[in-house]
Design a protein with these regions (language model features):
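Positively charged n-region of N-terminal signal peptides that target proteins for export
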Residues: 1-5
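Bacterial N-terminal signal peptides
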Residues: 6-15
Length: 203
């Protein structure tokens, strides 16, 4: 009798994980509500023809900076030797109809997903360009950006933040007397990075 009871208990316990696994849905959905997203755009306007001469924009989610990131060990563990999504939720996107030169590298007009890569020693940061077609083909979410093949990178310079950015802030600034020379700025908490952009645009 004891053997039968023990066998019954064993079978019952063995079935519990299988039942739990069967009750878990194989597919779930997230999102659907408006996200907190930002957009930095530079538009060139031909005043003679009264029409656009070209433009480029970076669209991105705005994650909130957390005080825990100010712990150097924690921040290094998150970023050293890794590519960060540089945003939240959907991919950060560069959409340009103009040829650009970013940190000295030619970037053809087109559509790119962006990330930030930090070197293994933590001394260098670079802007990572990812082919959206390859991401779509592999169904990769920005959360898993380190699974996405990086097409190329351009260096970014570390800057001193004027103030702590509570949310990720990406800006494109330019002097009024030289509008083809644009500075890309990425600010998040105590992190501040910049890269020069030269824009090719006809009058």
């Amino acid at each position: 009798m004891n053997i039968r009871i023990a066998l019954a208990v064993f079978v019952f316990l063995a079935l519990i994980p299988a039942h739990a696994q069967q009750s878990k849905p194989a597919l779930v959905a997230e999102g659907g509500q408006p996200d907190d997203r930002g957009s930095a755009r530079v538009l060139y306007w031909n005043t003679v023809k009264n029409e656009a001469a070209g433009q480029f924009a970076i669209n991105y989610g705005r994650p909130v900076w957390k005080s825990i990131y100010e712990d150097p060990a924690k921040f290094d563990g998150m970023t050293k030797g890794k590519t960060w999504r540089m945003g939240s939720n959907f991919w950060t996107i560069l959409d340009s109809c103009l040829p650009l030169k970013i940190s000295g590298r030619d970037v053809s007009a087109g559509y790119y997903y962006l990330g930030l890569h930090r070197s293994e020693d933590g001394r260098k940061w670079s802007l990572a360009f990812i082919d959206p077609a390859k991401v779509r083909a592999a169904h990769i979410d920005a959360y898993d950006i380190n699974k996405a093949p990086v097409a190329f990178e351009v260096p970014m310079s570390i800057a001193t933040p004027a103030a702590k950015a509570e949310k990720l802030t990406i800006e494109l600034t330019y002097p009024k007397d030289d509008i083809r020379k644009v500075t890309l700025s990425v600010k998040w908490g105590t992190l501040a990075l910049t890269a020069p952009i030269e824009v090719t645009v006809a009058e």
